[in-house]
Amino acid sequence: MAVDPSPPVVVITGASAGIGAGIAQELAGRGASLVLTARREPELRALAESLRGAVEVVPADVTVRADVDRVRDRALARFGRVDVWVNNAGRGITRPSVLAVSDEDLEAMVRDNTRSALYGMQVVVPHFQARGQGVLVNVSSMLSRIPFATVRSAYSASKAALNSLTESLRFELEKTHPNIRVVLVLPGVVATEFGNNAIGGGPDSRTIPGAQAVEEVARIIADGLFSGPLDLYTRPDGPERVLGHVRTLAGV
């Protein structure tokens, strides 16, 4: 189990809005030192100014490996270590059918949702290994386990690939580095601008009945950094819904 440092140094990608900004606000309130990164610098700086405590702003494109290296280097230069790295950056896409997904669509989803997180894993895990501890958090989606929203098929597939990378790394580290915690977060619909920002547009997530508040999701993630399940469903009915889906597919 990862050691809970006080206060932790936390890197958050995709921190300019949505779940990433919510996590930053929640952890700042708990006294964490933060490194916030996203492409939208004005939004990042506005968020940083609203937070208390030590905050480093690093505008970057996490689909570019050199940028991710730079985020890690800035974190180490400012704070001397990284305790938690949250791969939250990502984007959706809306297409009417699986058959309508183009090569470019799939490549964009893998770039934004899978490869960007892989870069984060590759740059921070060696640091965790050298220190003998750390927490890696990859934010996925319930759609990666229950791909019922077919208009999000390419998005769901890219997040399913992220799940596989996360679980493979977890297996790889559990015997050699038991104090490195690898957490997979599986949110449902969250009241953010995710739908509006999707390639091809989409329904406004904030108008979907039952959408979780960002603050609730951020609190659940913050509570689960250092203890609790490694597959972290932000909806209380998440595991039951996944199990029901598997049973349906299996015909049992």
Residue ranges, per PLM feature:
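Conserved glycine-rich cofactor-binding loop
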Residues: 16-17
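Conserved glycine-rich Rossmann-like NAD(P)H-binding loop of the short-chain dehydrogenase/reductase
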Residues: 30-47
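The beta1-alpha1 cofactor-binding region of Rossmann-like NAD(H)/NADP(H)-dependent oxidoreductases
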Residues: 60-70, 103
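Substrate-binding pocket helix/loop in short-chain dehydrogenase/reductase
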Residues: 96-98, 105-107
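Active-site helix of classical SDR
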Residues: 121, 158
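Residue(s) in the substrate-gating loop at a strand-loop-helix junction
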Residues: 141
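C-terminal helical subdomain
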Residues: 184, 200-244
